[in-house]
Amino acid sequence: MKTKLIILGCGNSMGAPRIDGYWGNCDKKNKKNARTRCSAIILRGSNSILIDSSPDVRRQLLANNIKNISSVVYTHEHSDQTNGIFELRPFAFKKKGNKKVNFWRKGNPVNVYGNFSTIRLLKKRFDYCFKSFYGYPAIVKGNIIKKIFSLGNYDEKINFNTKQVTHGLIETTAYVFENTAYISDCNDLSIVNMKIFQNLKHLVIDCLRIKKSPVHFNLDEALYVHNCLKPKKTILTNLNSDLNYDFLLKRLPKNVLPAYDGLKLNL
């Protein structure tokens, strides 16, 4: 069965354009420079696994005609990865098997997964999503990930291997699945020595800007990681408005591609 990864959003925490209309170096005439906040989805049969619920997730799912979410895996607890969690509410109304769920009695909460810190902070910030609140049932159920775990049933199952990597002062979860690694927020150059990231078909990697950052890879660092790990293809994500799509495309090696919203990868 074929598996697909869609980059729903590839922008940094402010997106492009920013809310004040600032495009930076990005040419607004090129649609690939319009970037919503980082999020992605894995599709395999009826199994739809969302990676992060960005503040733009409603718009992202509608734009890509995604009508079901089976579960969500979170990379970390920052707002640009999590603030769309309430948008998961319609999926708690979905049928469970052949039975229609009575949402108002018990709901059918969406399973969300993350490391201990992420789930703990999500429950604190969005308590009304995780438990019954003023008569409204919970819409999500928190689960702490194991190093290796699977989501889905039978031939639609996706197997995950995970690694905690440094993102400034916190740890973020890098997910490896279907010979693909997704590392959207990271400044941990030690990943070049980690076996889990070797012999990949696709590497989706943080690349914030040209200048160095204390919490993200910049362009030179992302290319260093690519050259060390040697995946068949690297996709740069978490791009801020300094990085114009065509500027990157002309300067990158043939097997390195700047992400854009809606980019589809066959895994």
Regions found by a protein language model. Name each.
Residues 1-183, 187, 192, 249-267:
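Binuclear metal-dependent hydrolase catalytic cores
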Residues 190-267:
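Binuclear metal-ion centers of metallo-dependent hydrolases, dominated by the metallo-beta-lactamase
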